[in-house]
Amino acid sequence: MFEPVAKNIFRWGTIDGESGIIMYSHLLLKEGKAVLIDPVAMPGLYKMIKVLGEPEAVIMTNHPHIRGSPLISSQLGILLYIPDIKEVEEDEAISNMFIDLYNMKHGIQYGGSTNLPFGIKAYKIPGRHEFALIFGDFMIVGDSAYGVNGKLNFYPSGIWPDETGSKSNATSDALIPIIKKTGAKGLLSGHNEDIPSGLQEML
């Protein structure tokens, strides 16, 4: 079920029944503990997690990446971190309804100054409703970037139509400065391929 990406980093995925797009989740390990990023629920998941490390927290990169996050955090009895509404959403009322509807009230809203598990740092992606997370040499994003045939792509390139390239250009303009600032060497994404190394050289 788990696919190794790099030392102390694994991923697993499942197909979205509506879009046909594969949704990927990541497990990060540090000192015998495990943090789950945008986890999708699957049979046998809890047992597999505990073989690798003691679950400590679930972190969502954006609110639409609900997947199994509220359920998994509740059933494992671990903390759930969700993006701070005021930092990533334009309509606070709708976002609060979203949180209520999907049972995320117990989630801790995080922002750029939050002390996340494993020393993970969060960076708001301008114009996008998500955070880029930094874990060691890796940047983690939900939707904004991913690999396609070994090359770096920016949302929605390679997933949804973008005939003029204006949308992917806007995403790259927002994310590239963060990649450069953090010096991230690899990319972990919620879709398509991860980029284990050479991220800076792809800019």
Question: Where on the chain are the PLM-derived regions?
Answer:
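Metallo-beta-lactamase
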Residues: 16-18, 34-36, 42, 123-202
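Conserved beta-strand termini and adjacent loop/short-helix elements that scaffold enzyme active sites
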Residues: 12, 83, 109-113, 123-125, ...
